[in-house]
Design a protein with these regions (language model features):
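N-terminal nucleotide-binding beta1-loop-alpha1 segment
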Residues: 18-25
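A cross-domain feature marking catalytic cores of carbohydrate-active enzymes
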Residues: 25, 59-62, 142
Length: 196
């Protein structure tokens, strides 16, 4: 059941309820995106936070035989238990192996999907809308997505917001996952945040 929009936008992103989904940041696709370094930096920070705070990670790869695997900096940053799943559908929600993985995590109480990747107006948009329609709370990371053209990101943003998805930043996610200062987790992640 979908909550009313006031409650949705008041929701904080909770590390205990989250899954991080990294969509199609692949070798032959990333170089033609706007500001690819920003995307890699953002997702690297999210992966470090997810690893530290035990947030499950799902990585999708669109037709990796043709587009290549996930880029090396992100592959090297993946937690050891991250799921890397192949897909052909633009929406990961339409790919059974991905949808089943998300559903297993939802059954354990992880109903918030934090989404980053490329392209914002194609696979990210369709994935976010697909899982939104399945009842997940969706937060799309603004600095962790890109497209070939800026107007494509703008159009995706408008549609996602209209559909009840949240538009957030990497720091918003990390600080909401942390929840408080003074903890070992906070001290561990603070240098990474300050370096950005």
């Amino acid at each position: 059941m979908v909550r009313d929009r006031t409650e949705e936008f008041a929701m904080l992103i909770d590390a205990q309820r989250s899954v991080l989904m990294v969509v199609d940041v692949q070798e032959r696709l990333l170089p033609v995106m706007q500001d690819p370094e920003r995307v890699v930096r953002s997702i690297s920070m999210l992966l470090a936070g997810a690893a530290r705070l035990s947030v499950p990670v799902i990585v999708t790869e669109q037709y990796s035989k043709g587009i290549g695997p996930t880029v090396v900096p992100l592959r090297e940053a993946l937690p050891t238990d991250a799921l890397v799943l192949e897909k052909m559908a633009f929406s990961a929600a339409q790919e059974t192996v991905v949808a089943d993985a998300v559903e297993r995590l939802r059954a354990s109480g992880r109903d918030q999907l934090v989404v980053a990747g490329i392209e914002a107006h194609v696979c990210v948009l369709q994935t976010a809308l697909g899982f939104r329609s399945r009842g997940c709370d969706i937060a799309v990371v603004a600095d962790g997505v890109s497209s070939r053209a800026p107007h494509s990101v703008s159009a995706a943003t408008a549609r996602l917001l209209h559909a009840g998805c949240q538009w957030v930043t990497t720091e918003m996610v990390l600080f909401e996952w942390l929840g408080r200062a003074g903890t070992d987790d906070f001290r561990s992640l603070l240098p990474l945040i300050k370096a950005d």
